[in-house]
UniProtKB/Swiss-Prot annotation:
Pfam families associated with the record: Toxin_20
SUPFAM superfamilies: omega toxin-like
Tissue-by-tissue expression: Expressed by the venom gland.
Subunit structure: Monomer.
Family: Belongs to the neurotoxin 12 (Hwtx-2) family. 02 (Hwtx-2) subfamily.
The protein's name: U4-theraphotoxin-Hhn1a
């Protein structure tokens, strides 16, 4: 009797864990579909990082103090990189 009860509880636990994992995968797949614009935003973020650091490097090569380029739209230039404020 105990073995049967343990087997039933084990199966129930596995079923719950499997269902939870399936729900997480479904949620992740929906986020990936909705998150496609985020990859475009990440590309913009990378461009901002690159743009700011390149402008500072060019100014340093000219033996001038590096004037930090002003990043717009909630971004600021810090350590030669645009960071979100």
């Amino acid at each position: 009797m105990k073995v049967t009860l343990i087997a039933i509880l084990t199966c129930a636990t596995v079923l719950v864990l499997h269902t939870t994992a399936a729900e997480e995968l479904e949620a992740e797949s929906q986020l990936m579909e909705v998150g496609m614009p985020d990859t475009e935003l990440a590309a913009v973020d990378e461009e901002r990082l690159f743009e700011c650091s390149v402008s500072c490097e060019i100014e340093k090569e000219g033996n001038k103090d590096c004037k930090k380029k002003k990043c717009k739209g909630g971004w600021k230039c810090k350590f030669n990189m645009c960071v979100k404020v």
